[in-house]
């Protein structure tokens, strides 16, 4: 689900930052409250999801019955949960750009073409990823559709799909996460050749113990009882998994999966695994994906260990910091303590060593001021600074806070993940709502975030395409001096 990192500790550290900044508690609370009263559009807005849906056109083009099924799914869509589980890339844990991810497929008679209608989530290209917005649209394979203009990959991805993992976005199915993640089951028998390929893949975070069961779900969804499934585990690691599901193996999933097979495939609408045991054969292969285009692909969500499960097992996260639906699924019956309070609440005075004494700086009248100096003294000191004098340590601390505050890294992370209200709240909590920013890294970060939002607006309007030279190549990027070295490679 995430780009490779140098080692397991780096992976844990990276996912901790993602869980802290990518889906803030305020977003979860607002989206959940709106979904609870049936306002699915408002819930999407709260979760940073743009709607490219025209339900009237869907009903007129594909029938009221199909439109009703889509509406039912939208009413139970938990957009904050979807954002929580979206594929991400290192080093910052941002959304993987340029994806079209199928959430659900709908077959109906009279469609124009062989493809079913897909409910899809789209991430913008990398040059327009400011705000980390997600688009929600419909795709039927027979027309371009809304939200596809300027998108690098408008067709649904075979690897990044969630139609077989509804528990990652559908509130009705969220409880299935415990079973599908393998958190409650002991490791099963290991396939032949485990020491050669299985152990290294497991060390990299692959959920090898789950591959056979998840590959069986993929084959069942295509109405097949035997076949080969391609597994992509990292940048250049490929595995072929040969399965024979006749008679169907008893995989003990404990689920009644609602799968929509292709018309005429002969598969049942519900997958019910029978008795027997699979005899899978897994082999490592080389070559690019072009050599395996005819094979079904194991979804990325089934390839890797669930990040939240990995964090819990490592003792790196408290259950209260997880998404409520994730926490209730992975730790049923355990009380949630809620997010931890900030160690330095907004408005609390800070201590500064000033000329041999301990002075305070804090917020007064919406601005950061020196609390232990009288106004006349401060005016004299400010005048001396204008005449190239040395400012008081209290004034130096205030100036430094306006240019390069201690919270700068947290502000940057929030801006990168699109949490502008959270970033501004941190700044206002430190400097006050009436603060005037001075030249420095903090102001640069905020201005850069504003420029990147312009790039996203151009993308949404279909007015910019960097490949055609219609927008500056650096319009959506942070200035070079703020770039950080990569600690990982893309899948």
Model regions and ranges:
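N-terminal membrane-targeting/anchoring modules of bacterial envelope and secretion proteins
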Residues: 1-212, 219-221, 430-490
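Generic structural signal for coil/turn-prone sequence and helix-edge features
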Residues: 95-237, 242-264, 268-356
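C-terminal structured domains
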Residues: 234-491
